[in-house]
Amino acid sequence: MNPLALSLILTTLFTGTLITMMSSHWLTAWMGLEMNMLTMIPILMKTTNPRSTEAATKYFMTQATASMMLMMALTINLMYSGQWSITKMTNPVASNVALMALMTKLGSAPFHFWVPEVTQGVELTPGMILLTWQKLAPLSLLYQMATYTNTNLIYLSGLLSILIGGWGGLNQTQLRKILAYSSISHMGWMLIILPFNPTLTLLNLAIYILLTLSIFMILANTFTTSMSSLTLMWNKTPAMTIMLMTTLLSLGGLPPLSGFTPKWLMIHELTKNNSIIMPLTMAIMTLLNMYFYTRLIYYSSLTILPSTNNMKMTWQFTNTKHTMMLPTLITLSNMLLPLTPMISMLE
């Protein structure tokens, strides 16, 4: 892609997200979402082939449908309340339709079907943007709407997302699809805690983005996209294999790594609000995710194929210009748990 065109696209993507996050008026927020959607399409089609074209088409049709639903909800709310303010979504029908539209944009269940297909059809870098940056704008709107949303609908979507995110990833061999189902599962945790403590939703989002960025950068640097290619990682890049192993354990929420922090705080918040069954169900369903993370670790770190000494030395001569951010990301991905008391004090 032309560097000038790419810089313009990325600037527009950043601006669209920023407009939505800073908006208190529904019309400007909707405009930011549309900028975000339209600039994401050429990013998905960075390499022109039938699979990326199909993925971009699916993304466009799903997001356009969600945008129409959102505009319909805004119109209904305007008719009944005369308000364009995001925090004044008082009409229950408009609130429910807007909630479903934003859930579709986020890719949470039962509106999740486009996420694995689109992620699998594109390269690792567009997939990384899709599963990280594209969550910011819709979730910022849900954060502002938290007071007026239908909590039962949020709980249902959250529990379904955790279940489907774990269940769907069990039988996958493609890493992009596994990370897509992981994204759906994490989105379920964020949605469930939203009515109780929106700040914890933002904390979970920040740590999820940090972990997902780390994994995608490791996979991009080792040119790994499937489980079969994971088995060669230890022979080629042992250092990155160890990084991948610890980051996957952190993504699964295993103590004492960073990914345990939001799960610990969210379960504590739910039990503090006399909700016992829900956090127990969430923790049990998350074991499905832990299973396929462990399977990835087994293939990458615990299975070593026969190799020659020449093959073992290749990791010393690989191009390292794209790995400058990795040490910082990996450190943050694995060592934030000691800061948990400070985070609790800030709530």
UniProtKB/Swiss-Prot annotation:
**Gene Ontology terms for molecular function:** NADH dehydrogenase (ubiquinone) activity
Keyword annotations: Electron transport, Membrane, Mitochondrion, Mitochondrion inner membrane, NAD, Respiratory chain, Translocase, Transmembrane, Transmembrane helix, Transport, Ubiquinone
Query: What EC number is given for this enzyme?
Result: 7.1.1.2
Q: Which PANTHER family match?
A: NADH-UBIQUINONE OXIDOREDUCTASE CHAIN 2
Which purpose does this protein serve, as stated in its record?
Core subunit of the mitochondrial membrane respiratory chain NADH dehydrogenase (Complex I) which catalyzes electron transfer from NADH through the respiratory chain, using ubiquinone as an electron acceptor. Essential for the catalytic activity and assembly of complex I.
Catalysed transformations (reactions): a ubiquinone + NADH + 5 H(+)(in) = a ubiquinol + NAD(+) + 4 H(+)(out)
Membrane-spanning segments: 3-23, 59-79, 93-115, 150-170, 178-198, 200-220, 240-260, 274-294, 326-346
Return the GO cellular component terms, semicolon-separated: mitochondrial inner membrane
Q: Which gene encodes it?
A: MT-ND2
- According to UniProt, the name of this protein is NADH-ubiquinone oxidoreductase chain 2
